[in-house]
Amino acid sequence: DFFITATERQRSIMLDQFNKYTPFTPHIVTIPVGSVDKLRKPEGERKPFSIITASRLANEKHVDWLAKAVVKAKESLPQVNFDIYGTGAEETKLKAIIEENQAQDYIHLKGHQDLTEVYKDYELYLSGSKSEGFGLTLLEAVGSGLGMIGFDVRYGNQTFIKDNENGYLIPRFEKDDEPAIVAALAEKIV
């Protein structure tokens, strides 16, 4: 018998918990929930100042924070362009944010698509989730060589984003202080 985890960090925490609370040391195997078949690089130049996110458009994914951060980043980086891939219940809210900020020229809702060959054309991937077990989109983005920005939360982001190496991990906020969160994201985008 054995346990399966999606990341080494989950495995380590599970072992620590068993060692702390039981005399039993289980056999734990890490099997990632996904993989990329090959690394993908752009055939030419990546689109300059291009940002992508891919997610269910759900409240817990906080894509609204990402859109607001791009609006704020545009004040310092007028060339920025943000494409949001995915569908879901928050789509109407995102459309309203885009319209309220007159951002139709640089923030685009792209719907659900096969992104296998899409990531490689962008420069930066944004993640707004504060709880990502593994994050297949993170794996796909890193497999295409994108810089990445996400929150410093266990598992997915900490697995794929190496702070100040291939991107930035935004420190966790105790409360959902939206203005501070949006400002922190915008600062790293710029």
Which stretches of residues belong to each language-model region?
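Donor nucleotide-sugar binding/catalytic pocket of nucleotide-sugar-dependent glycosyltransferases
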Residues: 2-40
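Conserved donor-binding/catalytic core segment of Leloir-type glycosyltransferases
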Residues: 4, 43-61, 67-70
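Nucleotide-activated donor-binding/catalytic signature segment of Leloir-type glycosyltransferases, i.e.
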Residues: 93-112
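Short alpha-helical donor nucleotide-sugar binding micro-motif in glycosyltransferases
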Residues: 112-113, 117-122
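Aromatic "clamp/platform" in nucleotide-sugar-dependent glycosyltransferases that forms part
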Residues: 130
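Short hydrophobic beta-strand element within catalytic cores of glycosyltransferases
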Residues: 147-151
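Short acidic/histidine- and often glycine-rich active-site loop of Leloir-type glycosyltransferases
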Residues: 153-172
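C-terminal "capping" alpha-helix adjacent to the active site of nucleotide-linked donor transferases
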Residues: 172-190
